[in-house]
Amino acid sequence: LILIRHLLNILVSKTKQMQTVYVIDAVRTPIGKYGGALANIRPDDLLAHVIKALIKRNDTIDVNAIEDVIAGAANQSGEDNRNVARMAALLAGLPVTVAGNTVNRLCASGLQAIMDSTRTIACGDAEIMIACGVESMSRAPFVMPKSPTAFDRQAQIFDTTMGWRFINPK
């Protein structure tokens, strides 16, 4: 207990002032609709397009100085199930040294990405980050729940645009 308290006193005494965080620019795609003009574009390609536009508009920022891309994505399944932030960053041409992190807070996933980026910069852990969000409900996959018995031929298919919880019978 004494060691922990002493350690806490050292940590508290060495904390630095929180950094002020600024939003430099914001870019977005048009708002789409289910099955609309954006329906044939993969979420990682869609996000990469927006990141490229952001970089082009802010060409004085060295892309090597970007430390992380945090993307909010509520429906992490199908094509965007493997860290869509990292995939989009690479597809946008960012260096492989730029990290990517995908967060999920359902409808507030993009907002969570902004909050996480803000907190990281405010704490002094990074200087330049990209916060973003992406979703394509038109491309959300259909799923089949696990069969109750082996070789069951009564498979049901569910649309994931309604969320995952609805197929749970509890």
Summary of predicted features, one role per range:
Residues 1-17:
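Short, Lys/Arg-enriched N-terminal segments with co-localized hydrophobic residues
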Residues 17-19, 33-63, 78-82, 89-170:
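Acyl-thioester C-C bond-transforming condensing/cleaving domain
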Residues 20-21, 68:
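A residue-level signal for beta-strand positions that form part of recognition/binding surfaces
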Residues 24, 66, 110:
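Residue-level signature of catalytic and energy-coupling elements of molecular machines
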Residues 24-25, 104:
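Residue-level detector of conserved, well-ordered beta-strand and adjacent loop positions
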Residues 26-31:
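Short polar catalytic/cofactor-binding loops
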Residues 65-72, 130:
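Short glycine-rich phosphate-binding loop at a beta-alpha junction
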Residues 71-79:
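A glycine-/small-polar-enriched, mobile loop at the entrance of the PLP active site in fold-type I
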